[in-house]
Amino acid sequence: TALYGPATKVGGLVGYNAGTVKDSKVDAKTLDLSNLIANDSTVTAGGALGENTGTGEKLNVFTDLTDSMAKYLNLGGVAGSSSGTLSKCTYTGAIGKDNGFTTVGSTVGGIVGSNDVVYNTDGTAAATGKVKDCKVGYIELKVQGASNVGASQDAATKMNSAAHIGGIVGRNRGEITGSTVGNKDKTGSIITARSGFVGGVAGSNSGSISTSGGLDTQRLVKQINAWLEVPYKNETTTDENGNKVTTKVVDTDKQNDNLNQMVRVLTGKASGDAEKKLQIDFKAMQGFDTLTYGEKDYNKVYTNRSYNQLLVSLRGGSGWGHFANGYLGGITGFNDVTGQITDSASGQWFVYADNINQSWGAVGGVIGQNESDAESNSGLVNFAAVRRFVRGKGRWDGRYNASNDDDANVGCEEYSTNANLVDNYVGGVIGTQENRTGDRWTLEKCVNIGTVFNSR
């Protein structure tokens, strides 16, 4: 499908939607903007809707969005941007190219690029973008990305200093609920950029994400929550006047039983048929680190992706000194001050930070960099294999050179002893926790089940 003429809001069905578009399908090989008359970084485009302030429901998009990347500001599989509602929408296809151009502030997402909030003059929300029960099946999202982020910047400055790349939403300021990425078959989807905020669900989050993440993870998240829920019982005692007093107290026996069962199931020591069934289900959901347990071949990480449902990656440029800059997380790369995430889990994924900036890049199975001031981020589960890797220097004619490519094996064995490397951090749930607003942050019912590897 080719589009012609001047425009900055472009959709496979509707350029600007303030009404309702539902029960529609876009099935085109590609959405071609090469003949569109527009300046760079000005176009908001989606496979179905350009800008949405109304409702898009049951929109199923099967198309590639890979042309004229320099023109985009907001790009999404279903909608470019939305302050309305996107409900029960699906996307399958390719977005961007290996080094497809995106600029600071740009957004790219499997469902919508930018999920927005519109404010009244008094600061209250007039409209909130909602992504509900949407699904991204097979996706190849590959962009260059962009980042001018520095470790000393405050959260607001960071949000405006990077590209936002996510499997469902690029930049989320609204609400994401009940939405997933992945297929039942290990089809090897990929979300990758060389710079910016990258996440399996959202590149960045300053809104809310709940009950979202990997396919078929929700029942296992509910089981984790049940194990970690504090049980209570009524206890009757007699006071100093001989009166019976009933109070609610923690049932420590039940609590210990639940925790012991969780440990048995998650460590492969299940007892009884019910526990063994759970053990199989949890084990089957774990992501696979192809560089630890697979072929251990760096030049096949990006081409042979059949081990996992999804590869989420920040991918540095060729050579030891060409670092990727940004934050990488299974659910979100950057959780902003107002961001809140609940009851969500990465899936059978590989979260891979390849040659990421040593000084301030952050990598986490759920959240890369967390600066949230939310009262609680709870019910977070990581199933993904998480790896952060800094390349060694390649050799050529006996001299050290920055010559190894980002998918080459040369020099990779030297990473652990190279004197130029500095300490860096990777986490199963959170890569880095930044207390910019004091000590007001709480994690509840969070569990890492995936493997975690750091090259330092």
Please give the residue ranges for each predicted region.
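Surface-exposed loop/turn motifs in large extracellular/passenger domains
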Residues: T1-R456
